[in-house]
């Protein structure tokens, strides 16, 4: 008897989602949440059965970039990648996952090739519609943890296509979404991401992890070593949710106090892209040597002006290290050191006098500080500033049916436990 791979996948998803809930909730709490999620999925699936498209118009492409939501497209986070793929002569279309109500209203649904339990019928039918509508050779998935991914992979396999998941950051955080691993290829930034995924106790599906580097970084981060004589500190701000917390207000206050006591230093503040920087707006009005950088100032441009970077809790510390800037971590929030900054840059700074001593240490042994940044960047970013070119080359090879370059490290990431 031939097994139905779609139904097998659906049953495995049930097991996976139950285990995800049990990681955070009691047996009763997990059961209630599981039932609530199942009811919502079942209702979507039931309605989807009556909203199937009578026919599917074809809008084919070589690459289909599937973003997590329509609003994400406007952020243009994949601009370099899109331009690179199109620059190589391929037809790339960019679209986004729609909410269930839109999928139902617009009949973006096609009956899956095999029977699927009602709970997952809506997801499977939309995945089938996407593949039949666009007929991509390679589908580039952006959303971590998407429950559509397993069905996209099945639909693509039936038509000779591939599902490639593009990590849009290092995968070192503890987000439950990173348990999804059901892709043909999983493009990772570097060694730290691979180690973090291998250490996870819950992985759904299998994939071939490829250390391609970051497709979001170009050679703008290749710059001369900083001039310590400029005495310019760049502070990387935290996200708008975190910066409201008292511990991060205290961290900001520590840095602002230090800046007031050291007018010989120029202090630049690069806010998080989503932050309005309310704390620093007040500081710059009262402190002449503090400058709040505007949204039009790129991270690379900010790093060019900096001699030392102060990081609190920002992914941008990786770009700072790649740019060859010494890094100091200042944090009163007590967050887990997910980037392993202490391993490379020393203990977290929690007082003004510590910051002063560490700056003196950088001035005393500048070569060591640069070596620490180089090692940190290599740990997190394969191929350094060449990540975009590496990613484009890998995508071209996959599209053309060729093997990946021997220079790329590939590792099989199996499901864990094995029944997922």
For the regions a protein language model found, what residue spans apply to each?
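Donor nucleotide-activated moiety binding/catalytic core segment of transferases
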Residues: 126, 274-323, 327
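C-terminal amphipathic helix plus adjacent low-complexity
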Residues: 2-20, 357-358, 363-420
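Helix C-cap/helix->beta junction micro-motif
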Residues: 134, 158-159, 229, 262-263, ...
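Active-site and donor-binding regions of nucleotide-sugar-utilizing enzymes
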Residues: 1-21, 35-60, 64-217
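Catalytic binding pocket for nucleotide-activated donors in carbohydrate/polymer assembly enzymes
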Residues: 183, 208, 315-382
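Conserved catalytic-core segment of nucleotide-activated headgroup transferases in glycan assembly
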Residues: 73-77, 215-283
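Short, charged, surface-exposed secondary-structure boundary motifs
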Residues: 102-104, 173-178, 196-200, 219-223, ...
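Hydrophobic/aromatic beta-strand patches that form the interior of the parallel beta-sheet core
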Residues: 91-93, 140, 164, 185-187, ...
């Amino acid at each position: 008897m031939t097994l139905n791979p779609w139904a097998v996948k659906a049953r495995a998803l049930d097991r996976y989602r139950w285990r995800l809930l049990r990681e955070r909730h009691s047996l009763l709490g997990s059961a209630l949440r599981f039932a609530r999620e199942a009811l919502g999925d079942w209702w979507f699936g039931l309605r989807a059965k009556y909203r199937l498209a009578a026919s599917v118009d074809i809008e084919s492409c070589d690459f289909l970039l599937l973003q997590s939501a329509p609003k994400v497209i406007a952020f243009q986070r994949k601009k370099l990648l899109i331009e690179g793929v199109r620059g190589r002569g391929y037809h790339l279309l960019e679209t986004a996952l729609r909410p269930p109500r839109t999928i139902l209203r617009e009949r973006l649904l096609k009956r899956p090739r095999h029977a699927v339990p009602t709970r997952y019928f809506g997801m499977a039918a939309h995945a089938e519609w996407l593949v039949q509508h666009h007929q991509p050779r390679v589908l580039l998935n952006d959303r971590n943890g998407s429950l559509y991914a397993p069905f996209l992979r099945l639909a693509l396999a039936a038509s000779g296509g591939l599902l490639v998941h593009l990590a849009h950051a290092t995968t070192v955080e503890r987000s439950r979404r990173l348990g999804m691993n059901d892709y043909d290829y999983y493009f990772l930034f570097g060694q730290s991401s691979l180690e973090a995924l291998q250490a996870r106790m819950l992985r759904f599906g299998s994939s071939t992890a490829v250390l391609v580097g970051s497709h979001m970084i170009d050679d703008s981060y290749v710059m001369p070593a900083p001039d310590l004589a400029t005495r310019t500190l760049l502070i990387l701000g935290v996200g708008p949710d975190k910066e409201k917390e008292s511990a991060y207000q205290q961290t900001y206050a520590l840095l602002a106090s230090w800046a007031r006591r050291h007018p010989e230093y120029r202090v630049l503040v690069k806010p998080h892209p989503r932050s309005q920087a309310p704390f620093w707006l007040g500081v710059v009005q009262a402190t002449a040597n503090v400058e709040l950088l505007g949204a039009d100032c790129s991270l690379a441009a900010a790093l060019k002006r900096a001699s030392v970077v102060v990081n609190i809790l920002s992914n941008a510390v990786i770009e700072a290290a790649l740019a060859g800037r010494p890094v100091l971590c200042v944090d009163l929030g007590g967050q887990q050191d997910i980037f392993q900054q202490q391993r490379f840059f020393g203990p977290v700074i929690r007082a003004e006098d510590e910051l002063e001593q560490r700056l003196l240490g950088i001035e005393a042994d500048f070569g060591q500080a640069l070596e620490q940044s180089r090692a940190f960047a290599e740990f997190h970013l394969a191929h350094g500033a060449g990540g975009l070119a590496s990613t484009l080359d890998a995508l071209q090879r996959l599209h053309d049916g060729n093997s990946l370059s021997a220079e790329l490290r590939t590792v099989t990431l199996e499901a864990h436990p094995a029944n997922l």
